Amino acid sequence: LRQKFVFGIGYDDDIDLAREAIVEEISAVDGVLTEPAPDTRVTELGDSAVGIQSRFWIDDPDRGDYVKVRSAAVQAVKERFDAEGIDMPYVHRQLVGEVDVNERTGN
């Protein structure tokens, strides 16, 4: 069963380092096939992040624990990104305008 997950990294981060980290960490997860090997592709240039899609295959989708394998892979990559100093930015929004608040007095 093929799994996909997109990791977002900062525009200032090293794409090659991030791709290498993704492949290494996912390859080390128990239940991920070595053939075909995990791979990555840069798929998005978003508002706040460069999207790198990972693709990997798990060995036995009938076991019903493919969600556990996917979770382990994503967690391993996140921890590696933290260790390497690779940023996983989130969208920043700025709200503009006014809010008028009238004080109410009453009994």
Predicted regions and their residues:
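Solvent-exposed, non-transmembrane regulatory segments of membrane-associated proteins
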Residues: 9-13, 35-107
